[in-house]
Amino acid sequence: MEIVGCRAENNSCPFRPPAMLFHGISGGHIQGIMEEMERRSKTEARLTKGTQLNGRDAGMPPLSPEKPALCAGCGGKISDRYYLLAVDKQWHLRCLKCCECKLALESELTCFAKDGSIYCKEDYYRRFSVQRCARCHLGISASEMVMRARDSVYHLSCFTCSTCNKTLTTGDHFGMKDSLVYCRAHFETLLQGEYPPQLSYTELAAKSGGLALPYFNGTGTVQKGRPRKRKSPALGVDIVNYNSGCNENEADHLDRDQQPYPPSQKTKRMRTSFKHHQLRTMKSYFAINHNPDAKDLKQLAQKTGLTKRVLQVWFQNARAKFRRNLLRQENGGVDKADGTSLPAPPSADSGALTPPGTATTLTDLTNPTVTVVTTVTSNMDSHEPGSPSQTTLTNLF
């Protein structure tokens, strides 16, 4: 049986299926198929009407036809079917961008707003979620190396003197005033009232509560002790003064200034004492070699427990005293300080150590009653015609 069409009931859907040809199907089955097709067409019509509203998706907020929405980015009307809603504002898909890197945020999961500006995640955390450099006021990421001074943090390139822009590194001395960093030279000038012109030394002292401002080093802590001094005629103070009046029964000392800044401030002294066995070891070696090298200083440091710097200073002052006493001996023949005869310096040809074949005797140099007699070879006598064959080292120190 061939069916070309079917008759529609009154008040039924105006759907008209095209002419179809059915073979081997009874009339009852054909009628059921047509009714099912009409039911499905009505359901699809209701879904289409519910999902379309003014030509837009129902999931988006409805736009009033009287007052169309304006894009918060470009300010134009939104006539697209899809738009974005961020911080209670409507945006074109192409207009929601990061204000820093211009990255389109339509496909991003998150965006951030600050003072009316839109940021992506990276720029927001870079600018607002980390500490800022005290010099350039830009963000510092967690992976960057920084310099710290008091409560401030600086980029490595921003930690410079506010006057000469000299880059300050770890270990350099610097001063701070009103969150400004100065190198040592300009900070000393600032203390003396010569720089800057609008800030006098009296005002600086009144603001800081004293006449001196602290120094800092590159580690970000206040320099409590005396910083290592550079040779400057303005300071006029020796780094280390050897106590030349010491004897065997008194410990030697190294005098150091505590704080030389400013010059008008009263200085404090920190004294380094030597024990008797340390003095004996140093004096015994001084009798052999007046100028020990780095290897000898290392061995002496292990024996005495002193630092190489302290040993260098002691030998430096001992050589100076030896030369001074030698000049006194040449002029008067007798050291006026203790009234004892002094030995001549070792010959340059003899080397640092006693030559082979020379009988050398080292005893306790701290005992004033024992003398050390050294027999000098004939070549040394020819090089030093005025030097005696016997020298007394007991009262040298």
From Swiss-Prot:
UniProt cross-references to InterPro entries, sorted A to Z: HD, Homeobox_CS, Homeodomain-like_sf, LIM_Homeobox_TF, Znf_LIM
Subcellular location: Nucleus
A Gene Ontology term for the protein's cellular component: nucleus
PROSITE patterns: HOMEOBOX_1, HOMEOBOX_2, LIM_DOMAIN_1, LIM_DOMAIN_2
Region described as Disordered: spans on this chain: 248-272, 330-365, 378-397
Keywords annotated in UniProt: DNA-binding, Homeobox, LIM domain, Metal-binding, Nucleus, Repeat, Zinc
Segments forming domain LIM zinc-binding: 69-130, 131-193
Biased amino acid composition, Polar residues: 387-397
SMART domains linked to this entry: HOX, LIM
Principal location class: nucleus
GO molecular function: DNA-binding transcription factor activity, RNA polymerase II-specific; metal ion binding; sequence-specific double-stranded DNA binding
Record has Phosphoprotein as a keyword: no
Tissue: Expressed in the dorsal thalamus and inner nuclei of the cerebellum.
Record keyword Repeat present: yes
Extent of Low complexity compositional bias: 353-365
DNA-binding region: 267-326
GO terms (BP aspect): cell population proliferation; dorsal spinal cord interneuron anterior axon guidance; female gonad development; gonad morphogenesis; male gonad development; negative regulation of DNA-templated transcription
Subunit structure: Interacts with LDB1 and LDB2.
Free-text function comment from the UniProt entry: Involved in gonadal development.
Protein known as: LIM/homeobox protein Lhx9
Gene symbol of the encoding locus: Lhx9
